[in-house]
Amino acid sequence: MIREANKFDKEAVIEMMKEFRDSADFIEILADDNLEYWHRLLDSIFAGAGKIFYQEGKGLLMCVIMPTVWDDKTFALHELAWFVRPEHRRGLTGFRLFEAYINYGKELKAAGRIKYFTMTKLDVSPDLDYARYGFRKKDENWIQ
């Protein structure tokens, strides 16, 4: 069952984020393990700066609310990480996490708290058609 992670899930969330980092082929950050930063980030998310949708032992989708680059009074919800452990990728965990995120984004938009919400597609992500879920492609990011 998908639920919101809380402070008692910190260690499990950090461990899962390390798995996400290691599987996403970000060679530039493989050695980064700043636990102090992770605890601060998670504390801010748990205090209301975002949410972590979580299925214990299976996967998570982490998102944060941030000001847009155009106006510090206009906010957007950004997905930071969507990860399902490989042994659970044939089930519904990934879709349910995605669905929880979409519902949260729609809820925030309807309440006027954000203007938009984003979804990231990594080069190692499944080839999903995000347009089916109301998203439109705006950019691509390249890393060097």
Model-predicted regions and their roles:
Residues T68-E79:
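A conserved beta-turn-beta hairpin within the catalytic core of GNAT-like acetyltransferases
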Residues Y101, I114-L128:
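Conserved beta-strand-loop-alpha-helix junction that forms the acyl-donor binding cleft
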Residues R40-Y54:
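A short helix-loop-beta-strand connector motif used in the catalytic cores of GNAT acetyltransferases and
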Residues G57-M66:
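Conserved beta-strand in the GNAT
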Residues R90-G105:
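Conserved acetyl-CoA-binding loop-helix of GNAT-fold acetyltransferases
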Residues M1-D33:
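Short amphipathic alpha-helix that is part of the acyltransferase structural core
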Residues L80-L92:
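A short, internal acetyl-CoA/4′-phosphopantetheine-binding micro-motif in the GNAT/acyltransferase core
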Residues T120, R136-Q144:
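Conserved catalytic-core motifs of GNAT/GCN5-like acyltransferases
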